[in-house]
Structure formats: C-alpha cells, structure tokens
C-alpha cells in the first residue's frame, strides 16, 4: 500500500501544479497582464489549498475511499478546466468569475489530498519519516510538472488537451487505487463505476478538443479561422474575411492584409532613407516577413538578418500558401537569414554591426516584453551600430497610449540618440507610432523605391507632425529596475478597453 500511495503523491502533485499553470496561462492569454494574472491565480490557489487542508479535519471515516473520490473530483474539474475557461470567455461578460471559481474549487480539492494521505499512512511509518517522504515526493512531482508543462505539454498538445491528459492521470490514480488499496467490495464497485464514467468523459473531451477549441475561438473572432496553432510562446490565429487576412497572437491583432502596408512602409522606409547607403539590415521581431518584403525593395541592400523568437511564426510565413504570398516569399530570399532565438541574448553574443536596425516587437504588455524597450536593451543594440547606423522601432499608439509612446522615445534619446518621432493612421489599429533614431541628426534621401502604396515625400513630411492630443508629455525613462513603460501601457490600454 505504501508504494502505491507514494506513486500517487508523485502523480497528483504534478496534476495539481499543472491545473494552476493552465489557469494562469489561459488568463494571461485572454486577459493580458501576465504578471498580474499569475500572481492573483497563484495566491488564490495557495489560499484555497490552505482552506482544503483545514477542511480535511472534518473527514473522519473511510479515508481511503474519500481520497479516491477526491481524485475523481479533481480529475473531472481540473481536466475540463481549460475547456470551461475557453468556452466561458466568449460567453460570459465577467470572465474572472468562472476563472477564480475554478481556481478556488481545484485548490480546495488539492488541499485535501496530502492531509488525507498522511492520515492514511500514519500507522505505517513514524511521523517524521512519513512527512519527509510524502512532502519530498510532492515537491518532486511539482518540479516535473513545471519543467514538462512549458517544454512539452503546452506546445505539443495545447492547453486544452493538456488539461484532459492530467485529468485522466488523476482518475487513473483513483481507478488504480481500487485494486491496490484495502477497500470493501461494495465501495470497489461504486468507485470503479464512477472512475469509468469520469474517465469516459475525459477521453471524449480529449478526442473533441479540436472541436471545442474551434467553437470557443469562433465565438471570439468574427471572421473565419483558417489557422489555429499553439506554440511554446504564444497562440497563433489567422482569420479570413473575403480577401482580408488577419493575424492574432495571444488574441491581439498583429496585422490586417487590407492595410498592413501603411504600417510596414512607415516602419521600414524612413530608416532606410535616413541611411546614405544601407547594405546590412537587422530586423528584430517581424517574423511574418512583411517588413523584410519592404526592405527588399531597396536594391542596394545586400543582406537582411531576421531575429525572431518563435520558429513557428517564421516557418508559417515561409511555407503556408496564403501567408507567404502576403510577404512575397521574402523569408526565402537569398539575401535573408532567419535566426530563431531571443533578440536580447543574440545582440549580446553577436559581434556584427548593421547599417539599419528595424524593431517590430509586440507591444510592452508584460515585463518580459518590457525589457526589450529598456535602456539596457538599447545600450546593447547600440554596440551593433556604427556612427551612420539608424534604428526604427514600432512604439504603440501615441493617441491611445500617449505616455507609453513618449516613454519609448525618451528612453532611446537618453542614450545619446537623435530621435525623430513618427506616426501613421492604420485603419485596423488607429493612430500608430514609431521612433526613428540615429547617432547623427536624421536626414532623408529623396529617392523612394518603386511600388510603395502609401509613403512618398509628402507623407514622409506629414507623419513627422504631431497634433496637440498626441504631443510630448513628461515621462520616466524605462529601465530594467523600474519597467515604467509596462505600467504606462497597462494603465492606458486598460482605460481604453474598459
């Protein structure tokens, strides 16, 4: 019996942590503010476990069958938790209600497990030996789950299937327990029947995960979903309405094929026109290849290095028929080198210098993204530039996130760069901002590449003029130790979305 229960501890501790990680990950995907969501969920989950541990004192008789019933309950609720959360988001206005109800319920049930197990085993071992073995196995199981969840389960199976898999493991513990633990025959029959029912539901859920995911995402997106993919880093959704293609990462619109040319022409061409003879170009982010498409319109460019964290994005936009058509197969051009790694780390390790650096990172909605807009990042980037090099970075909306925009501009200027703020109206986004910078005052060449749809000499002048409601405001410099930009961004966009 001891061995069976020790193995159970290892499994159930892994399951308990995975349910917590699932809730935190889904909340951060759907609601943003990763640090806030994980902090609230972890705190609520741990508190609920404490409540469960306290409630365990009221379980006095038939502890073994009660332990197995707890496992069935956790398997059912935890296994379906991802599906419930995805389906709730599109249907319930206050998504936080089902989110925290599930976290509390799972936390209470998980909190019951270890105290009940300790009481079952108390006659088998000395107390100090019992506690050390059970708790050490509990922590080992949590470690295994924390390693395997981001490396294997989430990217390979997706969040919904991962939930069902660990629910099946919980039920497997209960079903296995009916054979290896001492139980009355009447209890064995009941528990096995319950286990089979719950197991069947979870297997059906696993089998129909794609359908559940499709239905839940269809309720979130008005257009037809033509591609849905979970990677190690993000959820990728591509939608289509007539001839319009849209890319969403973690629920956030990245571009619409109807008007992305306005964004990408403004991101790319001012920087290339500000350099006397750009030959080596570095693109950080921009794995969709749309910025690279614009760069290749400058025939004097000899090489383009694209550094993007997620290989799934660059692979999709290299291989998928519709997507590679959008970027005109730019990622397969012989001038282009694609590197899939962390941009910050790559800059620190590289010894190359570039004439033009274009930065197309996601908005600074969390601290891991916010670090890419800090003085530390731009200081590292500066070492990859020479005296004539220029950089341009997308800088969120100067209208909707005014402080965020000027925080990025001031942070770059604080390192000795001459800056030129730019903005453009993109119908899909509204007003959008960029910052062009160099170690010399910015001067533009007059010769534009052919085939531009938006940018010309007149527009280049107009995008430098900011109306009063987008003009400069006092802001802090964004540093690693203050992450002021993330605070500005959260406050401003939450105000708009609310």
Swiss-Prot record:
Gene: speE1
Annotated residues for binding of spermidine: 264, 288
Principal location class: membrane
Residues reported to bind S-methyl-5'-thioadenosine: 234, 308, 342-343
Reported function: Catalyzes the irreversible transfer of a propylamine group from the amino donor S-adenosylmethioninamine (decarboxy-AdoMet) to putrescine (1,4-diaminobutane) to yield spermidine.
Pfam families per the UniProt record, alphabetical: Spermine_synth
Domain of life: Bacteria
Topological category with respect to the lipid bilayer: Multi-pass membrane protein
Record-given protein name: Polyamine aminopropyltransferase 1
